[in-house]
Amino acid sequence: MIDQYKHQQLRIGSVSPQQISTWANKILPNGERVGEVTKPYTFHYKTNKPEKDGLFCERIFGPIKSGICACGNYRVIGDKKKDRKSCEQCGVEFVDSRIRRYQMGYIKLACPVTHVWYLKRLPSYIANLLDKPLKELEGLVYCDFSFARPIAKKPTFLRLRGLFEYEIQSWKYSIPLFFTTQGFDTFRNREISTGAGAIREQLADLDLRIIIDSSLVEWKELGEDGPTGNEWEDRKVGRRKDFLVRRMELAKHFIRTNIDPKWMVLCLLPVLPPELRPIVQIDGGKLMSSDINELYRRVIYRNNTLTDLLTTSRSTPGELIMCQEKLVQEAVDTLLDNGIRGQPMRDGHNKVYKSFSDVIEGKEGRFRETLLGKRVDYSGRSVIVVGPSLSLYQCGLPREIAIELFQTFVIRSLIRQQLASNIGVAKSKIREKKPIVWEILREVMRGHPVLLNRAPTLHRLGIQAFQPVLVEGRAICLHPLVRKGFNADFDGDQMAVHVPLSFEAQAEARLLMFSHINLLSPAIGDPISVPTQDMLIGLYVLTSGNRRGICVNRYNPSNHRNQNKRIYENNYKYTKEKEPFFCNSYDAIGAYRQKRINLDSPLWLRWRLDQRVIAAREAPLEVHYESLGTYYDIYGQYLIVRSIKKEILSIYIRTTVGHISIYREIEEAIQGFCQAC
């Protein structure tokens, strides 16, 4: 629907029988009104054509083929005349066959039927409005109560019967026999109110504004009383107050939306358009039909049986009529929501029928799968894994996914570079996975961003743009720092990849959606690309080092009680052989790769002659003299090599390969930032 502000919207709610009739009914040029489905048939087994007035009737729902009626006559559609032409013999209009996607029909129910969503769903709207227990209403709807309190205010037999303190037991056996008498209809109309008709009468007598006023007065009275001191009574009062609030809100909703409560009881049952419940022919000539067709057939069968009982035979026992009304109610319940009353209905293969509720709800329902989310071209999906070698703005695409996503671009490049004469030759080269294909694919990907999306997309960081690179394997590689924006984990999460096709979409991806641009949370402004979990553990391992340093072991006051032999052993552990010296960081990392030292092994790294390394008043822990006159001033974390004239020849700092690695990463990042500025 389109509101007054020209906004397209979809609203689900109750509708009047007149509205249902308006949707389904149409008047043919000969004056005949069609729209009611009266037969439970689909297609004729000989002619393979839809049955007249059946669930696929062409007069009601429109022609199967555009411009062709059931007789086989053809007319050009699109005539500008106001009156749509139809066949004089079969009554089928000459219109587009797409009308079968939205043209509805209806079933005229022989008895009122309660909508199971409003009765059985919690909270029960009908029970809330009538202020009656749900079990009592269910017994009334499904005819489990033979008698109900009369709706009329005039004195009746049942009202007088309710005044007796004790009930004669023989009544329980004698009254059912009265159902078989000829005067039962008169007695039933006056004394008995049962089934969905009783619910409809009570809902029709409601005044919503009186309900709001009376509920508000009762709520205030309960609030003025205050706590009683009895926990059970206080809880009971609290539940009653909550119920009154829900009842007032429900009544206000009905007033605001201009919905009559009696519309929750159906008199006309809408029939979905045929294209939404198709019958499809598969291999071998077999037919596959939607479960909704079978459920509609069950409703029509039982409704026609009840109609025959009410119209053709006046001597039908009352219990049989009530039983048939119950069957109609159960058939409509199964159509709307199979299994809501307990055991679901199954077919001959013990498979549960898929009702209308099953079709529209859930992840695979009509709304989420077809309307809210759709399958689109140029998209793929795979598991995400960590790509530690990737930049923040890059993502790794497996070869299988990349060649499918960018296949059209690769084909165009192959033809432009005269490496393929036509599309077929280009596709064959792609299937054969020629080396030139991967080179062109890398070139295409170099200038084309992709979008990664992780469902559910709760905020704008749930979908970001990346520069794709080819990776081996079948998983999408992702930089670990962008994990938090997607709220993803590398424990089996899946992400979808989309290719923006238009220039506008590519420009938007580059300027607004790239991951290295979205570094702050759009909600609170805090940094969102921060190291967490495995990255923090890795940084800790890199920078932890070996705690057995000079100060910890040799000059710790708690070790003064150690014997000279132990001190001698400690001195031996920190010689040049145990703590090697390196001229630069490249030599240190090379030694680590050759497995000569460990990641946390202490080492001495030659440093530039920077006086800032030397503390102003720090005294050396040891001084080692060489035979040529040079000597070493050894401090806690560095040492200084001096000449005989006390000139500084070189400085060595005590570090580990882990510290060197993280320092180099930070230095490269700072240099790259300075160049970018």
Swiss-Prot record:
Catalytic activity: RNA(n) + a ribonucleoside 5'-triphosphate = RNA(n+1) + diphosphate
SMART domains given in the database record: RPOLA_N (SM00663)
Compartment(s) where it occurs, according to its Swiss-Prot or TrEMBL record: Plastid, Chloroplast
Any one annotated GO CC term: mitochondrion
Main localisation: plastid
EC category: transferase
One Pfam family from the record: RNA_pol_Rpb1_1
GO BP terms: DNA-templated transcription
EC number: 2.7.7.6
GO molecular function: DNA binding; DNA-directed RNA polymerase activity; magnesium ion binding; zinc ion binding
Cofactor: Mg(2+); Zn(2+)
InterPro entries listed in its UniProt record: DNA-dir_RpoC_beta_prime, RNA_pol_asu, RNA_pol_N, RNA_pol_Rpb1_1, RNA_pol_Rpb1_3_sf, RNA_pol_Rpb1_clamp_domain, RNApol_RpoC1
Swiss-Prot/TrEMBL keywords: Chloroplast, DNA-directed RNA polymerase, Magnesium, Metal-binding, Nucleotidyltransferase, Plastid, Transcription, Transferase, Zinc
Record's cofactor remark: Binds 1 Mg(2+) ion per subunit.
Disulfide bridge map: none
Binding-site residues, Zn(2+): 69, 71, 87, 90
Binding residue positions for Mg(2+): 489, 491, 493
Similarity annotation: Belongs to the RNA polymerase beta' chain family. RpoC1 subfamily.
Role: DNA-dependent RNA polymerase catalyzes the transcription of DNA into RNA using the four ribonucleoside triphosphates as substrates.
Subunit details: In plastids the minimal PEP RNA polymerase catalytic core is composed of four subunits: alpha, beta, beta', and beta''. When a (nuclear-encoded) sigma factor is associated with the core the holoenzyme is formed, which can initiate transcription.
Protein name: DNA-directed RNA polymerase subunit beta'
